[in-house]
C-alpha cells in the first residue's frame, strides 16, 4: 500500500486528545475518542492490505503475522523490560504480583481483558499498573490475529459472505455493548 499523507494527518489529530487527556487537561476528558480513531485507521489499513494481497493472490497469513511481529514485538518487549526493574523497586508485594500477571497478559495479547476484570482504566489503582496502556495494543493484536482468518474464510465462500458475516458481527457487537 502506498503512503497516504491524509492518514498521517488523521493520526496526528487523533493523538492530540489522547496526549491532552494524559497530560491532565480536564477539558479533554474524552481522550478515548482518539484511541477509537486509531483503531478505525488501523482496521482500515490492515483490511486494505489484506484484501489487496488476496485479490492479487499473494496473501500469506504467515508473512502477515511475521510483519506484525517484527513491527510490534521489539518495542513491546523493550517496554516490558524497562518496566520490570522499576516495578520490582517500587511496587508492594501484592502490586508486584499483579504486575507479574500483567506481564503474562501482555505477552499473550490479553491485557485488555485482565485490566477490565481487575479494575477500570480510570480507577485510582490504575496508577499502580505500569502496563495498563497496553490494553489498546492487546485489542489491536486480537484484531490482527482473528480478522485475517475471518477474511480468508469469507474469501473462500464468496464476497457476499463478507457483507453478511460483517453485518452479523456488527449486530452481535451492538447487542453485547447494550448488555
Descriptions of predicted regions:
Residues 1-179:
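Membrane-interface helix/loop caps of multi-pass membrane proteins
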Amino acid at each position: 500500500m502506498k503512503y497516504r499523507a491524509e492518514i498521517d494527518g488523521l493520526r496526528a489529530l487523533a493523538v492530540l486528545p489522547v496526549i491532552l487527556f494524559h497530560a491532565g487537561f480536564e477539558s479533554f476528558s474524552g481522550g478515548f475518542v482518539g484511541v477509537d480513531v486509531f483503531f478505525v485507521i488501523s482496521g482500515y489499513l490492515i483490511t486494505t492490505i489484506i484484501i489487496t494481497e488476496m485479490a492479487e493472490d499473494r496473501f500469506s497469513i504467515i508473512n502477515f503475522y511475521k510483519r506484525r511481529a517484527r513491527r510490534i514485538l521489539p518495542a513491546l518487549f523493550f517496554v516490558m523490560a524497562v518496566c520490570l526493574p522499576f516495578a520490582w523497586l517500587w511496587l508492594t508485594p501484592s502490586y508486584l504480583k499483579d504486575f507479574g500477571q500483567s506481564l503474562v497478559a501482555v505477552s499473550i495479547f490479553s491485557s485488555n481483558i485482565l485490566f477490565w476484570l481487575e479494575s477500570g482504566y480510570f480507577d485510582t489503582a490504575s496508577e499502580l499498573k505500569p502496563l495498563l496502556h497496553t490494553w489498546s495494543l492487546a485489542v489491536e493484536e486480537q484484531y490482527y490475529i482473528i480478522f485475517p482468518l475471518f477474511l480468508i474464510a469469507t474469501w473462500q465462500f464468496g464476497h457476499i459472505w463478507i457483507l453478511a458475516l460483517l453485518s452479523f458481527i456488527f449486530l452481535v457487537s451492538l447487542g453485547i455493548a447494550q448488555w
